[in-house]
Amino acid sequence: MTEPLKPRIDFDGPLEVEQNPKFRAQQTFDENQAQNFAPATLDEAQEEEGQVEAVMDAALRPKRSLWRKMVMGGLALFGASVVGQGIQWTMNAWQTQDWVALGGCAAGALIIGAGVGSVVTEWRRLWRLRQRAHERDEARDLLHSHGTGKGRAFCEKLAQQAGIDQSHPALQRWYASIHETQNDREVVSLYAHLVQPVLDAQARREISRSAAESTLMIAVSPLALVDMAFIAWRNLRLINRIATLYGIELGYYSRLRLFKLVLLNIAFAGASELVREVGMDWMSQDLAARLSTRAAQGIGAGLLTVRLGIKAMELCRPLPWIDDDKPRLGDFRRQLIGQVKETLQKGKTPSEK
């Protein structure tokens, strides 16, 4: 028994011919081009955070200008003139036995001494803040170093500056994990994964609490002036707490340098339309429609406070960010939204629910 033949199948289009992949031509560099070659580096942090992050970096970066040097030189000459004139008055009062003038000179000397002591203290605190940047550079070099002998002493100095006791469990785990055969990169990396997260967790809690208080305060307060004053106070307090956690004592000039960033935060908090319309790109349209203008403004101000806290952490932290351990804005976003929604639900009457 024979099977019937199958009918012929006609194809409309021609068969596709396989094409060999085309490769780019080989590029070669001569010796001159190889010597002048430099890899392009991209600042990933600024690309991720945007233009606002660049403005914050510029506000935190120390600036040196000719006008500043001239002002400092003038103040130094004025101070020397005041001291010289005071010495001359004291000598004249002693020779003429003018005890009233002599007492005034003594009081002035005490005031000047207190002022000089305050300036020296502020300069030391400002130097300590700048020294932290050098410590980060040193830590970055150690994280790329294969030498030995420097990593352990460096980490022990950081622990002492942060006020971590030798009996702390995290520090004890670090001591148990290191041994003599490890290089500086491995020792510092272990410190960054075992000890540093303890301080980072405390700083995160401070940021979360401050941002939540700012969010709820602005969401329920009807006075814009009170909101701005509250944000300024909370942000300054947040900076001080984060600096204290990382072993840095801020002085007047150190706070003054960071106050530019606080003013930037206040300016964004005052722009309710910008926060409500532009700042809702990370929220769904349904949630944005349910939130009131004050609640949206409160969330925006809270997120900006979080950004301020993250920048303060980056400035005061002795180690650079590694292995994506930098806190992100999205880590605090859901918590702020949940707190605002919970507050709005509590404020509604049973009939409204």
Swiss-Prot record:
The chain crosses the membrane at residues 70-90, 100-120, 213-233. It is found in: Cell inner membrane. The keyword Membrane applies. Keywords: Cell inner membrane, Cell membrane, Membrane, Transmembrane, Transmembrane helix. One of its GO terms (cellular component) is plasma membrane. Belongs to the UPF0283 family. This is UPF0283 membrane protein YcjF.
